[in-house]
């Protein structure tokens, strides 16, 4: 027998699925309520159903977690979140799953004894990000699904936080929380629980003028589902405490079937018996649901075509697993004496309750038989209880109306239910006041000219732009900074070193040494794209030299304040808020993107490797959709810089939008947002094109000229995300 604390965590998109999960052996269930969950199109729970589910879970010694794992707008957080959570908190909700750090800090302040689980949407990829969340009050982390067992084990050994990972179900092509594809394509934001799954659509792929020979239904980004039965012991031994099944959009039968199979094998492992997976169980899971087969996920491989379905063909069999309702055994003692009240005593799990009913009558004629009384008392219906034994003590010739027996039984069961859940309930709390803002600062008059910063991914583009007028500062990746940094340049322009979009593994020594040297010689700080990079820089004493990129979401003022208290220099305006929503946001420490190709996805998968083979070179592939729009896919083979890290170990793809984002015609509206600064981001542009675009925006924003008429998308600036 293995002495381990484990948890089998199942999904429920409806109350029926919740019952199916509990009945099949789940230790805990995660659900979405009427709002703020990352599966907005699941049936989800009403308030009454959710409170009942919390109570039912506690009766059976199970736990229930509520998803609040979306990004919230100011009015939602300020006006709705407290009242939304309060009844569930009072009912004894075990934890909330959270993505938004503004929501995180709000819950920590208003519900201090409510556990917070950091969602996989936070894109936690390493130990320092995990420690940062631990310091802020998280009790559990759901790291990025892309992490290997080796990475997870290292995190577990160095932090006391619980680790939860996915063991079965759908895989996103993008790092969770780093996907804007559905949002940009059709306004349905994955960060709001409304993903339309454009990664499951057909795309043709070209690279170096070569087209991959897939058919018209070839889905270049569609991953197989994950199934980890064969490596479950490895996952547990790496330090994963909670084994999470994906599938809140699935039917109760799926939840019951998958949960039951994993319960069987988790118990097998914990019992100390030889661990062996039966082929019939693998087939059973595929019959429940399959998307081109299954894979083991990223636990023991970094990427590869073996993980890809390359199709969106979903299959589910006609299997209907038994959905079992579990019952708690109760012990009862019924006392019936003439001219005395009916007395029913019930005991369950150390709790004893007593109910008294109407008066027992003396039977003048035919006395009531015990069998008839027992039949009536054993009618427990759809309750959470079943009789283990019921002693009936009859003193003399008695008669009791059936109505009286029913009433005393219902009263006793109601008392018992309340006794079992009462210890889990919490007292009411009052909403804590939000911090008063400096209204003069939030609504200061903005001058016509704001500082303009330029981000350059390509060294040749940076070379052309370095001597252009009107630029306050530059954001450079390592290779570009290494090539062009000088104390003289740092004296004339603010220089910031950009971190990789995804931070995994050890930060290369050369990167750290060079960054420290450049700081000593005048470099201002860092443009940070992820929590891990920030946490590492903060640990080194550089937290107050960090600028947050748009991928570090600050949708609401609570999140702005969270980072302001951290001391960061500024944040980047979120790309999914519209102009009207931005007017209700504190932008005084924010930088607005004026131009750039929006990253739609960051993926550990590689289009080039999967379809053409890996060359280890920075190259660009192109996806073409059914409307003939082409989306550049940049292969970031050396995220830290060339020759300073193990090549391709933690490389990634960035999929950009087909049309660049640009606001040359929105100068008057931009001026009303009370911003700190503006940014132009150059990624894949040729040097001369970048120079021409810079000139256009300089003409409009600094010289009061007219836009050139180039084609841009305004993204969400006008429409916003759902």
Label every model-predicted segment.
Residues 1-24, 28-40, 47, 51-55, ...:
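Surface-exposed amphipathic alpha-helical tracts and adjacent flexible/coil segments at the periphery
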Residues 122, 126:
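Conserved phosphate-binding/catalytic loop of the ribokinase/pfkB sugar-kinase fold
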């Amino acid at each position: 027998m293995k002495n381990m604390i484990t948890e089998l965590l199942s999904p429920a998109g409806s109350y029926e699925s919740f019952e199916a999960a509990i009945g099949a052996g789940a230790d805990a269930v995660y659900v979405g309520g009427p709002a703020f969950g990352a599966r907005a199109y699941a049936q989800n729970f009403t308030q009454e159903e959710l409170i009942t589910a919390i109570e039912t879970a506690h009766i059976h010694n199970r736990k229930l977690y509520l998803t609040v794992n979306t990004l919230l707008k100011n009015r939602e957080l300020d006006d709705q979140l407290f009242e939304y959570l309060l009844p569930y908190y009072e009912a004894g909700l075990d934890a909330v799953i959270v993505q938004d750090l503004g929501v995180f800090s709000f819950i920590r302040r208003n519900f201090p004894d409510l556990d917070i689980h950091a969602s996989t949407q936070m894109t936690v990829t390493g130990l320092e990000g995990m420690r940062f969340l631990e310091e802020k009050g998280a009790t559990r982390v759901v790291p990025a699904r892309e992490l290997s067992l080796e990475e997870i084990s290292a995190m577990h050994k160095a932090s006391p936080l619980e680790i939860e990972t996915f063991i079965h179900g759908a895989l996103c092509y993008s790092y969770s929380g780093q996907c804007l594809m559905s949002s940009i394509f059709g306004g349905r934001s994955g960060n709001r629980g409304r993903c339309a799954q454009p990664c499951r659509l057909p795309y043709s792929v070209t690279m170096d003028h070569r087209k991959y020979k897939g058919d018209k239904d070839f889905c270049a980004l569609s991953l197989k589902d994950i199934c980890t039965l064969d490596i479950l012991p490895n996952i547990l031994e790496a330090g994963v405490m909670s084994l999470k099944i994906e599938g809140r959009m699935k039917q109760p039968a799926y939840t019951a079937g998958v949960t039951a199979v994993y319960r069987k094998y988790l118990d097998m492992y914990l019992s100390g018996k030889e661990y062996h997976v039966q082929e019939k169980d693998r087939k059973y899971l595929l019959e429940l649901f399959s998307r081109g087969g299954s894979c083991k996920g990223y636990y023991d491989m970094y990427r590869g075509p073996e993980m890809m379905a390359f199709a969106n063909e979903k299959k589910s069999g006609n299997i209907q697993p038994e959905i079992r309702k579990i019952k708690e055994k109760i012990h009862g003692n019924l006392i019936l004496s003439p001219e005395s009240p009916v007395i029913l005593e019930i005991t369950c799990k150390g709790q004893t309750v007593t109910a008294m009913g109407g008066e027992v009558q003396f039977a003048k004629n035919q006395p009531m038989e015990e069998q008839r009384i027992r039949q009536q008392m054993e009618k427990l219906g759809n309750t959470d209880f079943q009789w283990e034994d019921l002693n009936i003590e009859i003193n003399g010739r008695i008669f009791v109306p059936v109505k009286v027996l029913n009433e005393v039984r219902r009263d006793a069961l109601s008392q018992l239910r309340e006794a079992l859940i009462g210890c889990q309930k919490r007292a009411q709390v009052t909403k804590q006041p939000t911090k008063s803002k400096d209204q003069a600062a939030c609504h200061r008059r903005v001058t016509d000219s704001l500082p303009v910063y330029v981000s350059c991914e390509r060294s040749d583009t940076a070379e052309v732009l370095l001597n252009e007028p009107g630029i306050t500062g530059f954001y450079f990746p390592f290779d570009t900074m290494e090539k062009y940094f000088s104390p003289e340049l740092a004296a004339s322009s603010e220089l910031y070193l950009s971190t990789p979009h995804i931070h995994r593994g050890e930060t290369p020594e050369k990167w750290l040494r060079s960054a420290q040297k450049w700081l000593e010689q005048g470099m201002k700080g860092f443009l940070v794209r992820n929590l891990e990079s920030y946490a590492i820089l903060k640990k080194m004493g550089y937290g107050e030299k960090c600028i947050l990129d748009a991928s570090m979401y600050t949708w609401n003022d609570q999140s702005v304040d969270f980072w302001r208290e951290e001391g960061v220099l500024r944040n980047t305006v979120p790309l999914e808020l519209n102009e009207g929503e931005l007017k209700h946001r504190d932008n005084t420490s924010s930088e607005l993107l004026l131009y750039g190709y929006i990253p739609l996805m960051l993926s550990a998968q590689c289009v080039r490797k999967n379809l053409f083979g890996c060359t280890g070179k920075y190259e660009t592939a192109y996806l073409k959709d059914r409307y003939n729009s082409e989306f550049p896919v940049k292969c970031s083979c050396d995220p830290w810089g060339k020759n300073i890290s193990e090549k391709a170990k933690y490389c990634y793809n960035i999929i950009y939008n087909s049309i660049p984002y640009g606001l040359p015609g929105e100068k008057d509206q931009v001026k009303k947002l009370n911003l700190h600064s503006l940014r132009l981001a150059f990624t894949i542009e040729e040097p001369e094109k970048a120079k021409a675009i810079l000139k256009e925006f300089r003409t409009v924003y600094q010289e009061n000229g007219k836009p050139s008429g180039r084609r841009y998308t305004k993204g969400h600036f006008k429409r916003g995300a759902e």
